[in-house]
Amino acid sequence: MSGDKDRRLPFDRDREMITKAEVETDPRYGCPPEERPIEEYIMKGVINLDKPAGPTSHEVVAWVKEIFGLSKAGHGGTLDPKVTGVLPIALEKATKIIQTLLPAGKEYVTIMHLHGDVDEEELERVVKEFEGTILQRPPLRSAVKRRVRPKKIYYIDILEIDGRDVLMRVGCQAGTYIRKLCHDIGEALGVGAHMAELRRTRTGPFSEENAVTLHDVKDAYEFWKEEGWEEPLRHVVRPMEEGLEHLPRIEIRDTAVDAICHGANLAAPGIVRVEKGIQPGDLVAIFTLKGEAVALGVAKATWKEMLHADRGIMVDTKRVLMEPGTYPKAWGLKTPGE
């Protein structure tokens, strides 16, 4: 069996932040995401929901909106009605991060039912041939055009075999059809196969280990509304920043924040810390020194260039996540340590 190996999705990399300048943040402005007032916390929150079998992803989002009385919410990747598991739901202002979750790597646990008997060693060998880049044509009932698409399978681990039922863990690129994968493995084995059950265990930085149920969400909201008890709600709703943990990270000075909130690009002098490994073209998340998400952008330089440059645009700002005025304009503001 191959289930005991350390298998990782692309963003499960070893990460290291490199400091460019020793700078502190002014406590008068902004606040750590976990310490936001509860109303703001909800509006900038993400729920790592464990979707039950039955409802559509859209219906689950509608229920969450109804519980909180929200006008806007969105999910990070559709699950079919019968499929259970990780469905990140972004609330109100946090819906701006949804587009970063949709292409993020996914992990599933599936039961593949074989239509004939197969030797275990042969099964292991054939399954391993499906790791790497494969070509998939979406199923007939898919909503997308049925042209062949390359998809990356990062790993397939056989966890258990019970007769003709094979329990597998699959780490894959977004948009991979596990139903089609099971069918194609069956064809390669010469006996045929179909997907009997499916559960999503990871979406980007969210995993089933800390997923919550709709019941948890409703109870936590009612505890807060009726008794003023915030703790359960702060457990089921997480800061939107947790939904950006799969992206390369750049931290900036207080004095650079407001300009970016107005749509300016990030220049070299504003950078305090950079994640090692950033390359031009990478989608990056820009944070304050308190850990607040400021914006999403596309890197224009390598991490080394960002560390050593004293001028020039390092990141093109693509999506602003923080409201202007959270931090003062640069003039008249000196952060401690500058």
From Swiss-Prot:
InterPro entries: Dyskerin-like (IPR012960), PsdUridine_synth_cat_dom_sf (IPR020103), PsdUridine_synth_N (IPR002501), PUA (IPR002478), PUA-like_sf (IPR015947), PUA_sf (IPR036974), tRNA_PsdUridine_synth_B_fam (IPR004802), TruB_arch (IPR026326). Keywords: Isomerase, tRNA processing. Its EC number is 5.4.99.25. It catalyses: uridine(55) in tRNA = pseudouridine(55) in tRNA. Pfam families: DKCLD, PUA, TruB_C_2, TruB_N. Residues 247-322 form the PUA domain. One of its GO terms (molecular function) is RNA binding. Could be responsible for synthesis of pseudouridine from uracil-55 in the psi GC loop of transfer RNAs. This is Probable tRNA pseudouridine synthase B.
